[in-house]
Protein backbone atom coordinates (compact mmCIF):
# COMPACT_ATOMS: atom_id res chain seq x y z
CA UNK A 1 0.00 0.00 0.00
CA UNK A 2 1.42 3.42 -0.89
CA UNK A 3 1.53 6.46 1.37
CA UNK A 4 2.83 9.94 0.57
CA UNK A 5 4.98 11.91 3.02
CA UNK A 6 5.14 15.69 2.62
CA UNK A 7 7.85 16.66 5.15
CA UNK A 8 11.53 15.64 5.17
CA UNK A 9 11.51 15.29 8.98
CA UNK A 10 8.60 12.84 8.84
CA UNK A 11 10.44 10.83 6.18
CA UNK A 12 13.59 10.60 8.32
CA UNK A 13 11.53 9.46 11.32
CA UNK A 14 9.89 6.80 9.14
CA UNK A 15 13.27 5.66 7.78
CA UNK A 16 14.59 5.24 11.35
CA UNK A 17 11.71 2.98 12.35
CA UNK A 18 12.43 -0.61 13.32
CA UNK A 19 10.29 -2.07 10.51
CA UNK A 20 11.91 0.02 7.72
CA UNK A 21 13.66 -2.41 5.37
CA UNK A 22 15.07 -0.45 2.43
CA UNK A 23 15.12 2.88 0.60
CA UNK A 24 14.90 3.26 -3.18
CA UNK A 25 15.91 6.55 -4.78
CA UNK A 26 14.37 7.35 -8.18
CA UNK A 27 15.85 10.30 -10.05
CA UNK A 28 13.92 12.07 -12.82
CA UNK A 29 14.87 15.23 -14.70
CA UNK A 30 12.63 17.44 -12.51
CA UNK A 31 12.41 15.60 -9.16
CA UNK A 32 13.85 12.91 -6.90
CA UNK A 33 11.64 10.33 -5.20
CA UNK A 34 12.64 8.59 -1.98
CA UNK A 35 10.68 5.41 -1.29
CA UNK A 36 11.06 3.66 2.07
CA UNK A 37 9.65 0.14 2.47
CA UNK A 38 8.12 -0.58 5.86
CA UNK A 39 6.15 -3.65 6.89
CA UNK A 40 2.73 -2.28 5.97
CA UNK A 41 3.21 0.70 3.63
CA UNK A 42 5.61 2.00 0.99
CA UNK A 43 6.18 5.64 1.95
CA UNK A 44 7.14 8.12 -0.80
CA UNK A 45 8.72 11.56 -0.48
CA UNK A 46 9.06 13.73 -3.61
CA UNK A 47 11.78 16.44 -3.62
CA UNK A 48 12.23 18.91 -6.48
CA UNK A 49 15.48 20.46 -5.15
CA UNK A 50 18.54 18.38 -6.13
CA UNK A 51 20.74 19.79 -3.32
CA UNK A 52 18.17 18.88 -0.65
CA UNK A 53 17.96 15.41 -2.15
CA UNK A 54 21.74 14.95 -1.81
CA UNK A 55 21.64 16.13 1.82
CA UNK A 56 18.80 13.74 2.57
CA UNK A 57 20.69 10.86 0.95
CA UNK A 58 23.68 11.59 3.23
CA UNK A 59 21.48 11.68 6.36
CA UNK A 60 19.76 8.32 5.83
CA UNK A 61 20.36 5.75 8.61
CA UNK A 62 23.52 3.69 7.98
CA UNK A 63 21.94 0.26 8.56
CA UNK A 64 19.31 0.75 5.86
CA UNK A 65 19.73 -0.80 2.39
CA UNK A 66 19.84 2.07 -0.14
CA UNK A 67 19.25 1.35 -3.83
CA UNK A 68 19.65 3.96 -6.59
CA UNK A 69 17.33 3.57 -9.57
CA UNK A 70 18.29 5.57 -12.71
UniProtKB/Swiss-Prot annotation:
It comes from Mus musculus (Mouse). Coiled coil: none annotated. One of its GO terms (molecular function) is structural constituent of ribosome. Component of the large ribosomal subunit. The ribosome is a large ribonucleoprotein complex responsible for the synthesis of proteins in the cell. Component of the large ribosomal subunit. This is Large ribosomal subunit protein eL38. GO terms for cellular component: cytoplasm; cytosol; cytosolic large ribosomal subunit; eukaryotic 80S initiation complex; postsynapse; postsynaptic density; presynapse; ribosome. The keyword Nucleotide-binding does not apply. Belongs to the eukaryotic ribosomal protein eL38 family.
